[in-house]
């Protein structure tokens, strides 16, 4: 646990540094693309550099996997923790001053769903906030940066059985009829649309408000979804399931049933309260 605490404390330091960089950084694009074909923002690259430099200082870190790196970066061959991360989720929204964040998954020895032992995310908005799921079976912990520059524990996060928020992503013209019917049912039941375009912000709102659904389905142009399994989807699945919520890819009972074949693999994904995920399964099983 001491080594994990070193990682958690490093994530806190990273969050504080990136939060400051965001305020004044150049928001322009580079001339490079990341491993999944997105043109990199200078802020993406800078955030990745900050995270890499911080984790290189820890002897317990075996390797790093980043959205902005083509391949796994080995740090200490004999260490046991692999950190997979999205350095700045929603970075294209910084220029309109929306909240964005960083996502971290901590794997032990090998990158497999069952080897994900902890996860965290930071959110850079009007306030700097952090959520850490320290271990399987424990409620995620919510922190907020205080006036003294240190993170203060606020509360543990637990989702209700049923929520009222509906954060629905992907281009609607590419939705399947099954997904369209499901989303229409949520709106017919009175769910409120809450979608910013930043995964961290939308999932954070559902967690803090107690429940609802975040969806990024398969579409006609992206049948395997767009969100990355290793450093976006599984870390949030770990957090949501430990907050007594549920997750799925629309086929499996949980996102942890996904088989990882490559580090930049994508998947359709759904996160939410148990009632919403149960309803989704009913619709998807009818197709």
Curated annotation (Swiss-Prot):
Its EC number is 3.1.3.11. Belongs to the FBPase class 1 family. Pfam families: FBPase, FBPase_C. Keywords: Carbohydrate metabolism, Cytoplasm, Hydrolase, Magnesium, Metal-binding. GO terms for molecular function: fructose 1,6-bisphosphate 1-phosphatase activity; magnesium ion binding. This is Fructose-1,6-bisphosphatase class 1. Its cofactor is Mg(2+). Homotetramer. It comes from Campylobacter concisus (strain 13826). The gene is fbp. SUPFAM superfamilies: Carbohydrate phosphatase (SSF56655).
């Amino acid at each position: 646990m001491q080594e994990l605490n070193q990682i958690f404390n490093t994530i806190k330091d990273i969050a504080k540094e990136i939060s400051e960089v965001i305020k004044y950084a150049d928001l322009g694009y580079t001339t490079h693309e990341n491993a999944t074909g997105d043109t990199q923002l200078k802020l993406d690259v800078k955030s990745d550099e900050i995270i890499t430099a911080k984790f290189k200082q820890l002897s317990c870190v075996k390797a790093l996997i980043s959205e902005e790196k083509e391949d796994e970066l080995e740090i200490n061959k004999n260490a046991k923790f692999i950190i997979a991360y999205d350095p700045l989720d929603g970075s294209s929204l910084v220029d309109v001053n929306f909240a964005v964040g960083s996502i971290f998954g901590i794997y032990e020895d090998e990158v497999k769903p069952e080897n994900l032992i902890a996860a965290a995310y930071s959110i850079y908005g009007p306030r700097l906030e952090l959520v850490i799921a320290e271990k399987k079976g424990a409620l995620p912990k919510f922190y907020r940066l205080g006036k003294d520059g240190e993170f203060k524990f606020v509360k543990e996060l637990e989702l209700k059985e049923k929520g009222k928020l509906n954060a629905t992503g992907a281009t609607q013209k590419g939705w399947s009829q099954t997904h369209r019917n499901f989303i229409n049912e949520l709106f017919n039941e009175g769910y409120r649309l809450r979608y910013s375009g930043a995964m961290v912000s939308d999932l954070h709102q559902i967690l803090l408000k107690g429940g609802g659904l975040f969806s990024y389905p398969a579409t006609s142009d992206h049948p395997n979804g767009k969100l990355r399994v290793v450093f976006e989807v599984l870390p949030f699945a770990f957090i949501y399931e430990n907050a007594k919520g549920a997750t799925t890819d629309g086929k499996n009972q949980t996102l942890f049933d996904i088989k990882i074949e490559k580090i930049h693999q994508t998947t359709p994904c759904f996160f939410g309260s148990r009632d919403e995920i149960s309803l989704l399964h009913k619709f998807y099983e009818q197709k």
